[in-house]
Amino acid sequence: MSNTKSSSKDIIDHIAIVVKDIEQSINYYTHQFKCEVIFSDDTWAILQFENIKLSLVVKEQHPPHIAIIDDTISNDPKSKTHRDKSISKYILDPDNNFLELLSYNKK
């Protein structure tokens, strides 16, 4: 997400959907589709498809959202550093959909 004009387009890193049961959803998606589990715990999982990641999240822990790579947030005091050292913050679009701005650049 950049306000500067560039020839490259922004990248959607993942889409997060709310599920009732992480393990049950992992089983469904990995048997129904060709994807790989790259992380899972009790509150979320990440499945890697060929072109995008799908996050399965528990509603009480994570909102459904679209994550867009935005390396400009690395120095934003409102951003949060995660255990994998990625940095993110949530914003709302005009229709109150959650967007996660995400950077893999290390602080």
Regions found by a protein language model. Give the residues of each.
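N-terminal beta-strand motif that seeds the catalytic metal site of vicinal oxygen chelate
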Residues: M1-I26, K53, P64-I66
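Loop/turn position at the start of each blade in beta-propeller repeats
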Residues: D10, D42, D84-S86
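Charged, low-complexity surface patches
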Residues: V18, E36, K85
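Vicinal oxygen chelate
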Residues: I22, Q61-K107
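Conserved active-site tyrosine of GNAT-family acetyltransferases
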Residues: S25-T30, N96
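Short linear motifs in intrinsically disordered
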Residues: F33-I38, K78-H82
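Conserved short beta-strand elements that form part of the metal-binding/catalytic scaffold
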Residues: C35-I69, F98-N105
